UniProtKB/Swiss-Prot annotation:
The active site is at H171 (proton acceptor). It comes from Rattus norvegicus. Belongs to the sirtuin family. Class I subfamily. Its cofactor is Zn(2+). Residues 44-304 form the Deacetylase sirtuin-type domain. It is found in: Nucleus, PML body; Cytoplasm; Nucleus. Its main location: nucleus. It is an enzyme of class 2 (transferase). NAD-dependent protein deacetylase that links transcriptional regulation directly to intracellular energetics and participates in the coordination of several separated cellular functions such as cell cycle, response to DNA damage, metabolism, apoptosis and autophagy. Can modulate chromatin function through deacetylation of histones and can promote alterations in the methylation of histones and DNA, leading to transcriptional repression. Deacetylates a broad range of transcription factors and coregulators, thereby regulating target gene expression positively and negatively. This is NAD-dependent protein deacetylase sirtuin-1.
Amino acid sequence: MIGTDPRTILKDLLPETIPPPELDDMTLWQIVINILSEPPKRKKRKDINTIEDAVKLLQECKKIIVLTGAGVSVSCGIPDFRSRDGIYARLAVDFPDLPDPQAMFDIEYFRKDPRPFFKFAKEIYPGQFQPSLCHKFIALSDKEGKLLRNYTQNIDTLEQVAGIQRIIQCHGSFATASCLICKYKVDCEAVRGDIFNQVVPRCPRCPADEPLAIMKPEIVFFGENLPEQFHRAMKYDKDEVDLLIVIGSSLKVRPVALIPSSIPHEVPQILINREPLPHLHFDVELLGDCDVIINELCHRLGGEYAKLCCNPVKLSEITEKPPRTQKELVHLSELPPTPLHISEDSSSPERTVPQDSSVIATLVDQTIKNKVDDLEVSEPKSCVEEKSQEVQTYRNVESINVENPDFKAVGSSTGDKNERTSVAETVRKCWPNRLAKEQISKRLDGNQYLFVPPNRYIFHGAEVYSDSEDDALSSSSCGSNSDSGTCQSPSLEEPLEDESEIEEFYNGLEDDADRPECAGGSGADGGDQEAVNEAIAMKQELTDVNCTPDKSEHY
């Protein structure tokens, strides 16, 4: 392959894709390798759709793989990473030289300064938390001989506390620690005292003057390979599994994210998670708080599973999306109307850009103020902070320069019709509609879940949003007559796109050394082309292209 131009290969793989000229050959080769090594995408089975199908599978299957992530430990009280007062924020205060929060998981930074990591370690160290209902459900499946393997991305060791025996800790855990120099290994209890006293634990066997003789918990850091145990187990399990259940994971961290595409495609797959995973095709999607969903499944399974239930009430199913409450409708009516302009060549109203940018800023600020004020009165602080961050996005409209030639109002004498709707104008047109979004699950009463045919269920806690016309007032929507589709936000069936998926595509380019042997396969389909198209467009905007597991996945 020496002397071969990777652009030639990319042209053959993706004929309609033209990589930007500024991408170097190394990056292009990484894209080629990523495409060729990606397992083919699985298609949903048409004969498995309902929660009844899921329960039947749980009753009949004997070799179940359960893949778990952050969602199974949310209810255990483990500290949050990203909130205003979370671990990341406090580390930034205590360690101002920390370049970014995730640097504490970088092995090179750890060698230079292990203190940030050990401050974090104290907060989630084993022995402080109890297993969730999800952990207990998996442990009972293990006890009954139904569990083939639990692959967890978490590092909290709660699987062991729950009694799960057939466990693979994909990203390591705090259960043991080993010396960076001599690899001497000890149990977590041997270094507990030092960690809770905020003393960097030292190796008892290495010379005292050896600066790197540090007892590091055996967590997979950036720059380290996954445990060999993961690869060996996956090589065997992929041919034995008869059901895959994903619980509480976004599946954006490779190689674990490749598991659903690496097992035989006829094996049924069930998702239990707060949000959908649009890059994968599950047969049944149970969306919401993981413990709430597992509680309902335990009711339906009966026997020993019913004894695990935290909530004695079995939920009732509804098939019609609940309407907005009167309070929500009143709030929506307070959104400012989008200015309209009747163009000379169209009978339908077209929204235009106010000619004074101060008008935009005023409208946005007023709406933001109303939105935040309402949140502060009606919702807990954590919810206010989360939604305020979303609302803050729309302050960026203030920076739009309406006199910029790239930003043309409808009716402008310059530019053709296709240039009238610029990116900035699209943002302006859509911001009221985005403000109007809210979680469908918040409309459910305490004993309901919503069935969205053919295979999606919305439980409490589901991060699935609605913006359909029957939910929003006409003054706050983008309109239904647009042919361009630029204003159409994702509907109930289409969750908001997460740019981290694009980032994860690039993260995955460099992690081939960590890819399990079972993740073979070749070929590029439409999904590959779309991913590459988006990825190369975002390349210059990405600042972190680490390839090893993202520890924030645990939270």
